[in-house]
Curated annotation (Swiss-Prot):
EC number(s) from the headed UniProt entry: 3.1.21.10
Domain of life per record: Bacteria
Record protein name field: Crossover junction endodeoxyribonuclease RuvC
Species the sequence originates in: Pseudomonas putida (strain ATCC 700007 / DSM 6899 / JCM 31910 / BCRC 17059 / LMG 24140 / F1)
Entry-linked NCBIfam families: ruvC
Amino acid sequence: MTLILGIDPGSRITGYGVVRQTARGCEYVASGCIRTGSGELHERLQIVFRGVSEIIAQHGPVTMGIERVFMARNADSALKLGQARGAAIVAAAEAGLEIAEYSATQVKQAVAGTGGANKEQVMMMVMHLLKLTQKPQIDASDALAIALCHAHTRSSLVPHGLSTARRRGGRLRL
């Protein structure tokens, strides 16, 4: 049994999802959003860092999947997103978690079967795979999808010894 944290980073809303990976598949543990409000950027980044740290302390995941930054039309937004990712990554690294990064296309492919899936399709598959009866918040749904993608990737890497080989070395880029 492995607890996996998925993070959908954002400078205003960061989604998180925790799943338990067992031999039978994945089970829902928790999800939600870290809302940073409209303060100064450094204050919002501190809220992301503390929020992720609290989630790790509360649930005890051993590994984290996080979405990579995509190049947005607005460079300022992409920079802020990258900084929020950094705050979440540092929180996970401080706690000793294995960290893996995934593109949005990889997450959609792993969860919905196609890299072109829309947010509603991803959410419906997350609900189906985790047997959820209520729709999670969209950012939490994305984070759960990232956690499921990470679980799927770990399942295919573990038989080859790749997951544990990189555990202490920091980020595992896929």
